[in-house]
């Protein structure tokens, strides 16, 4: 990925860290979590729940799948600030040598998720997202490390703002073919959508930060890196019992029945009696 150039420094997003042991760039971790969120949506949620979500948001399943990947991939955009990046000694030296270091004094802890919430509200506003939707989806990202005390910290530096723009565009290209859109959200849908999206994000981030994906930096350097991560995600979900069991319905009465009177429960017997009284012969409905 090409870096942006501002003044005398030449750095790119692949040099900014999201994880340090082992190193993962913000782009690698973002793509990993985005793919995991998509796989959780497609494989963990029951088909009926997916259909209900699509109906609530008025979109097709492939559209919401793309959006979920894009949205989840941006969850750590708040780490793209000098005050966070400089927490790692090696990065602080690099920032100093590139005149990117900004002194920071604050007695409270820096919470990257809260910073990310504020960054995304502004970015999505610029991209034309509806106010209710952008506030909700940014707010969910702001809660993905729920319960932690600390502050959102934005240093409003032009080079770092360029990093934010580049990161958002990179994730949009990766998951949404560079086309921005955000589903509309009605007031009475906010609670259900918040619970579902927050759950998917927390689970995806937890899995993506674990040992099963510690080599994601190497995987994404391969030509088929995306496919490998999808397979790895499916394997993790399957081995750990996260996949929904498919519900199969018989298309032949003979496979499922008949239910004989002597083995029928009370409801079955009542149905039999109704059919007998109105003298209808043939197939029998049963529960």
List PLM regions with ranges:
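Beta-sheet entry/capping signal
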Residues: 138-140, 282-285
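Accessory nucleic-acid engagement/destabilization modules that flank
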Residues: 4-253
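Conserved pre-motif I regulatory segment
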Residues: 247-284
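Beta-edge loop/turn motif
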Residues: 75, 286-287
């Amino acid at each position: 990925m090409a870096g942006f150039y501002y003044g005398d420094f030449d750095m790119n997003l692949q040099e900014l860290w999201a994880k340090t042991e082992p190193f993962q760039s913000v782009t690698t971790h973002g793509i990993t979590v985005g793919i995991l969120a998509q796989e959780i949506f497609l494989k963990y949620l029951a088909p009926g729940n997916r259909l209900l979500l699509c109906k609530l948001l008025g979109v097709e399943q492939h559209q919401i799948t793309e959006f979920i990947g894009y949205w989840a991939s941006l969850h750590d955009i708040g780490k793209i600030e000098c005050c966070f990046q400089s927490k790692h000694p090696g990065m602080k030296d690099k920032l100093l040598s590139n005149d990117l270091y900004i002194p920071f004094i604050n007695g409270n802890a820096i919470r990257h998720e809260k910073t990310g919430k504020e960054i995304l509200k502004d970015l999505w506003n610029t991209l034309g997202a509806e106010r209710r939707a952008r506030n909700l989806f940014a707010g969910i990202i702001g809660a993905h490390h729920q319960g932690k005390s600390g502050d959102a910290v934005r240093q409003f530096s032009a080079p770092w703002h360029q990093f934010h723009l580049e990161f958002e565009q990179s994730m949009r290209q990766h998951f949404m073919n560079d086309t921005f859109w955000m589903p509309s959200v009605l007031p009475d849908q906010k609670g259900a959508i918040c619970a579902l999206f927050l759950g998917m994000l927390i689970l995806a981030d937890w899995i993506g930060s674990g040992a099963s994906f510690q080599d994601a930096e190497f995987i994404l350097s391969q030509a088929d890196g995306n496919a490998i991560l999808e397979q790895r995600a499916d394997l993790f979900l399957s081995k750990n019992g996260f996949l929904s069991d498919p519900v199969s319905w018989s298309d032949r009465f003979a496979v499922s029945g008949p239910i004989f009177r002597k083995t029928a429960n009370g409801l079955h017997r009542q149905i039999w009696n109704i059919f007998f009284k109105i003298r209808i012969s043939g197939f029998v409905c049963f529960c």
